[in-house]
C-alpha cells in the first residue's frame, strides 16, 4: 500500500487521509499525473482545454 500525500481543496492543508481532519472535506491527490511521451489521451485533453478556453487552432 502506497501512501500519497493529499490536499484539501477547501482549506489547502496537506494530509494522508481521504477526509480532511480540519474541515471534513474530501481530499485530492496532490501529485500530478505521470508524464508519458506516448500519451494516448493527450490530444483529447488538449482539444477539451482549447474548447473550454475558447482558443482557436491555427492550421
Swiss-Prot record:
Superkingdom, according to UniProt? Answer: Archaea
> Is Phosphoprotein there in the keyword field?
no
| Keywords for this protein | Ribonucleoprotein, Ribosome biogenesis, rRNA processing
* GO molecular function term, any single one: snoRNA binding
Q: Which GO terms describe its cellular component?
A: ribonucleoprotein complex
Q: Name one Pfam family in it.
A: Nop10p
One of the GO BP terms on file: rRNA processing
The record's annotation in SUPFAM superfamilies points to: Nop10-like SnoRNP
Functional summary from the UniProt entry? Involved in ribosome biogenesis; more specifically in 18S rRNA pseudouridylation and in cleavage of pre-rRNA.
Quote the PANTHER family the UniProt record gives: H_ACA RIBONUCLEOPROTEIN COMPLEX SUBUNIT 3, RIBOSOME BIOGENESIS PROTEIN NOP10
Q: Would you identify the family this protein belongs to, as annotated?
A: Belongs to the NOP10 family.
| Protein name in the entry | Ribosome biogenesis protein Nop10
**What organism does the record attribute this protein to?**
Thermococcus gammatolerans (strain DSM 15229 / JCM 11827 / EJ3)
